[in-house]
Amino acid sequence: MHNDKDFDQWNEEKKVLHADAERLFFHEREIWYCHLGNNIGFEQDGRGELFLRPVVIIRKFNNEIFWCVPLTRTLKDLPFYFAFAMHVDTETSNEQSAAVLSQIRLIDAKRLRRLVGYISEKDFALLKKKLKALLP
């Protein structure tokens, strides 16, 4: 079996993240670049040297942990994908994105890198409704 993922590089980055005492302040509905890392099988990976991927924060439990859903630019018409216009806090007003609902994860705030934007209240309500529909 061919394995082209660099788990060793991700492990080194994870050690740095773990040792970092800083946790950034975040809110539900925000979209952040997050160090998701190199993962197993079909789990969503981060990209680049820092293993980053945008995520939308679904549920904040406290200042340390939250549920998030990874985002992709690949739009698929499947029940576990939710397409929406991401509102970016920079010069770009809207960017099409899709939340991969089946990949919901509990994340420590140490993994957060940079605030990118947010999802509208209307789209956030629809996203949560679609997430709940996936439960048995």
Segments predicted by a language model, with ranges:
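Pocket-edge structural micro-motifs
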Residues: H35-L36, P70, S102-Q103
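Short, charge-rich amphipathic segments
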Residues: D20-F25, V55-P70, E121-A125, A133-L135
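Loop/turn positions that initiate beta-strands
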Residues: E28-R29
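C-terminal terminal-subdomain/extension
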Residues: M1-N11, V16, L24, A85-P136
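Short, charged beta-turn/beta-strand-edge "cap" motif at the junction between a beta-strand
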Residues: G37-F42
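Compact nucleic-acid interaction/catalytic patches
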Residues: Q44-T90
